[in-house]
């Protein structure tokens, strides 16, 4: 696929996500081709159309501006606006965010135990799901209290701030005073790419199997550091994601890597290839039906 095609696909996904998948992929593609992938302008024009058509008192809570004349008069935009009616208390926030060009998203960790594969994705808050690129199964994120990786610590005893490998809920000794500290959060991979931010301390924790164990250790605990996992012949996955149970929405959820380690263009190309393969499989299965 050409770079132009990739940019088009990104804009289609963003437009669809702004309206929670209620705009069809075909209609979104038509609008993005017509208006040069301007998902911001088209999104705001749809909100404007909803406000003009709705006429309820609730529409006063939508702060809109007159869109360009070509968008205001466009029949496809008008049709989409009509299909999204009526305006309700439940969907008002969706329209407000679309007007502000906001797509609330979070960085989440995913882990497939069968493939022993761990990855991070930036996903919409309303649908936190990602597909393992090895087995193609879709997963929910690793629970927040089970995440692992490079963690951020704040020692309550000496006020020292430090970072190191850990799993949420497992204590590590402070590099300043040795006091056992729980991690406050796990940092997405991009935060660890800056060499100036990396710790100069050798990893050490109180887990029983840590390659550089700190005493007294805690029996029955396992170290999250990759070196310990490899040395002990343990899988990379400390806590697996649950398989995602589909709600029926087909909107692709990879919006932006936001500086994470993988390239968004490659991810979209990969998604498109897999979607085409899935469609071919469905057609073949349908062709063999009685």
From Swiss-Prot:
It is found in: Cytoplasm; Nucleus; Cytoplasm, P-body. GO terms for cellular component: cytoplasm; cytosol; nucleoplasm; nucleus; P-body. Its main location: cytoplasm. Residues 102-150 are annotated as: Interaction with PABPC1. Signal peptide: none annotated. Residues 272-290 have a biased composition (Acidic residues). This is Shiftless antiviral inhibitor of ribosomal frameshifting protein homolog. The lineage of its organism: Eukaryota, Metazoa, Chordata, Craniata, Vertebrata.
């Amino acid at each position: 696929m050409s770079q132009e095609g990739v940019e088009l696909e990104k804009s289609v996904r963003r437009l669809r996500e702004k309206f929670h998948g209620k705009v069809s992929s075909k209609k979104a593609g038509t609008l993005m081709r017509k208006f040069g992938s301007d998902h911001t302008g088209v999104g705001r024009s749809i909100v404007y159309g909803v406000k003009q058509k709705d006429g309820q008192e609730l529409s006063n809570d939508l702060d809109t501006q007159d869109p360009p004349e070509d968008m205001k008069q466009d029949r496809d935009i008008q049709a989409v606006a009509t299909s999204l009616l009526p305006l309700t208390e439940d969907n008002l926030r969706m329209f407000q965010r679309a007007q502000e060009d906001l797509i609330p998203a979070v960085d989440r960790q995913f882990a497939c135990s069968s493939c022993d594969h761990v990855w991070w994705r930036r996903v919409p808050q309303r649908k936190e799901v990602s597909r393992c690129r090895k087995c193609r199964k879709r997963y929910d994120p690793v629970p927040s209290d089970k995440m692992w990786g490079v963690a951020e610590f704040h020692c309550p005893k000496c006020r020292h701030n430090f970072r190191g490998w850990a799993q949420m809920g497992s204590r590590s000794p402070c590099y300043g005073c040795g006091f056992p500290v729980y991690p406050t959060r796990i940092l997405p991979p991009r935060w660890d790419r800056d060499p100036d931010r990396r710790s100069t301390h050798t990893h050490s924790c109180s887990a029983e199997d840590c390659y550089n164990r700190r005493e007294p250790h805690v029996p029955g605990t396992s170290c999250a550091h990759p070196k310990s996992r490899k040395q002990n012949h343990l899988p990379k996955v400390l806590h697996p994601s649950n398989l995602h149970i589909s709600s029926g929405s087909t909107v692709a959820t990879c919006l932006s890597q936001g500086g994470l380690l993988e390239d968004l263009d490659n991810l979209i190309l990969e998604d498109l290839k897999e979607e085409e393969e899935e469609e071919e499989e469905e057609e073949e299965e349908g062709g063999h039906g009685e």
